[in-house]
């Protein structure tokens, strides 16, 4: 068990735990009284945090079965009202949101493989580290309400110039 912002979360050896990026998202995402999608939710720390701290409605989504199970367990344990969907990015998402918070892999494939950071079954980015984030940027337009906001996580292990160019072309 770990704690994130006072929220107790069950985890295991093969699931992602909250990081400094998770902490930063909790601080910068404008979630109060908003309908939010937490895309790439991991074990659910942000979705639960948003739900317990004033979000109007929260949907948590991840492709990895273990993350879906742990998010469900953690939401129940913390009495957080969250809709949980197993989805490869937006594949099983059908609603529009005021805010999308996204933390999918932005680590280039070679680094992900060398470090072993990603459990088996979790999609890894391509050699640029940008392909999944770029897909989110492009597809998010279909899932954001007018004046909606997209928050994405990208690291120095991603082709930031490619990501910025995609943002400029789409937003």
Give the location of each predicted region:
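Conserved SAM/SAH cofactor-binding pocket of Class I
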Residues: 20-110
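Class I SAM-dependent transferase core
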Residues: 1-30
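Conserved Class I SAM-dependent methyltransferase catalytic core
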Residues: 130-171
């Amino acid at each position: 068990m770990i704690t994130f912002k006072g929220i107790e979360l069950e985890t295991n050896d093969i699931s992602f735990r909250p990081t400094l990026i998770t902490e930063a998202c909790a601080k910068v995402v404008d979630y109060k009284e908003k309908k939010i999608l937490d895309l790439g939710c991991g074990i659910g720390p942000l979705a639960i945090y948003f739900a317990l701290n004033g979000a109007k409605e929260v949907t948590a989504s991840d492709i990895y079965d273990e993350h879906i199970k742990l998010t469900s367990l953690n939401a129940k344990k913390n009495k957080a009202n969250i809709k949980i969907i197993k989805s490869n990015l937006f594949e099983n998402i059908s609603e529009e949101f005021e805010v999308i918070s996204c933390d999918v892999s932005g680590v280039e494939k070679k680094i992900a493989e060398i470090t072993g950071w990603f459990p088996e079954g979790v999609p890894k980015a391509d050699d640029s580290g940008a392909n999944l984030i770029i897909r989110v940027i492009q597809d998010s337009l279909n899932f954001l309400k007018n004046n909606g906001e997209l928050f994405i996580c990208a690291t120095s292990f991603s082709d930031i110039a490619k990501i910025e160019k995609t943002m400029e072309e789409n937003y």
